[in-house]
């Protein structure tokens, strides 16, 4: 175990996702079983005590890879020298809240965090935004970190990807391991588009193994509205599954995608597939040499085009709204 430790910052660390995430990071699941980790837990002042309680529990696990924990309410301290930043803490939408108010409230969180990452994060920093609206929160943070390469800012659609894998596997009576090349396009919202036209199940096109009515009327809405269904059933939003997807996203980013497969992540668009340059949108991606790259050359049929465009239009509207608020 001669590897240098990786510093991982988790915001909203005292929340449910943070609680589900931190023990898995400390056990070595984020990067790998040979990489020591140092944890930084960032919280708002009134939640610092709760985060300190979580830190006590982490200590009590005696994880061999865990080389230290720091709890703070100061963003500059939290992101100083950090290699991986998991931005989980966000302002949730409350009843009757307009989208503009939600974007403004989150701007107040993600602008200073972007500035703090810009000021002090390690040169190899990787940022994953989990807190919703994740794509646009990532855009705000990235806009305020001009010295960090834009490609280092990502938002999480791996939870949607994993949800889609399981829905398809259950429909066809196969293992999730039998499914390759599934894609989530667009926004992490109800407009997202889970694409089966390029996905393969045991080497055959997935969309050809299900009927069109199931795909359009059951599969797509089930994946898109799964978060709401979990709130309805559990009385609280997805926490362990979101934490699991965050682990998957970073682990893949660092260690690579399997040969002959890809995954989904919201990354800064380079104009591929008609997505305006600079938007943070979900694409099919491969991870190579520690970088996410958009899979090129896929043919997009009319069914898919309409759905991708609808989600991308929503992202453009969100970007315009935060621009008007002076957050970009």
UniProtKB/Swiss-Prot annotation:
It catalyses: (S)-malate + NAD(+) = oxaloacetate + NADH + H(+). SUPFAM superfamilies: LDH C-terminal domain-like (SSF56327), NAD(P)-binding Rossmann-fold domains (SSF51735). Its EC number is 1.1.1.37. Keywords: NAD, Oxidoreductase, Tricarboxylic acid cycle. The active site is at 188 (proton acceptor). Pfam families: Ldh_1_C (PF02866), Ldh_1_N (PF00056). GO terms for molecular function: L-malate dehydrogenase (NAD+) activity. Substrate binds at residues 93, 99, 132, 163. NAD(+) binds at residues 12-18, 106, 113, 130-132. GO terms for biological process: malate metabolic process; tricarboxylic acid cycle. It comes from the Bacteria. Catalyzes the reversible oxidation of malate to oxaloacetate. Belongs to the LDH/MDH superfamily. MDH type 2 family. This is Malate dehydrogenase. The gene is mdh.
């Amino acid at each position: 175990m001669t590897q240098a430790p990786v510093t991982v910052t988790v915001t909203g660390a005292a929340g449910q996702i943070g609680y589900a995430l931190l023990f898995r990071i400390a056990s070595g699941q984020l990067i790998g079983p040979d990489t020591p980790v140092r944890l930084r837990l960032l919280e708002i002042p009134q939640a610092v005590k709760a985060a300190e309680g979580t830190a006590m529990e982490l200590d009590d696990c005696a994880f061999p890879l865990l080389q230290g924990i720091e709890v703070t309410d100061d963003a500059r301290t939290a992101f100083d020298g950090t290699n991986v930043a998991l931005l989980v803490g966000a302002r949730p939408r409350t009843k009757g809240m307009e989208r503009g108010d939600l974007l403004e409230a989150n701007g107040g969180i993600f602008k200073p965090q972007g500035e703090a990452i810009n000021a002090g994060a390690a040169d190899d920093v990787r940022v994953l935004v989990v807190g919703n609206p994740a794509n646009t929160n990532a855009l705000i943070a990235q806009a305020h970190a001009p010295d960090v390469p834009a490609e280092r800012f990502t938002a999480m659609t791996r939870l949607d990807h994993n949800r889609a894998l399981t829905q398809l596997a259950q429909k066809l009576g196969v293992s999730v391991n039998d499914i390759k090349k599934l894609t989530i396009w667009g926004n992490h919202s109800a407009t997202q588009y889970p694409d089966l036209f390029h996905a393969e199940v045991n080497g055959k096109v997935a969309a050809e193994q299900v009927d069109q009515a199931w795909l359009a009327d059951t599969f797509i809405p089930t994946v898109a509205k799964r978060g709401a269904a979990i709130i309805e059933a559990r009385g609280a939003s997805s926490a362990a599954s979101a934490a699991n997807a965050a682990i998957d996203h970073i682990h893949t980013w660092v260690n690579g995608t399997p040969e002959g497969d890809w995954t989904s992540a919201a990354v800064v668009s380079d104009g591929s597939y008609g997505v305006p340059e600079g938007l943070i949108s979900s694409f099919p991606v491969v991870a190579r040499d520690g970088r996410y790259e958009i899979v090129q050359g896929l043919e997009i049929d009319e069914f898919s085009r309409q759905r991708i465009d609808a989600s991308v239009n929503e992202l453009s509207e969100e970007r315009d709204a935060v621009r008007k608020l002076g957050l970009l």
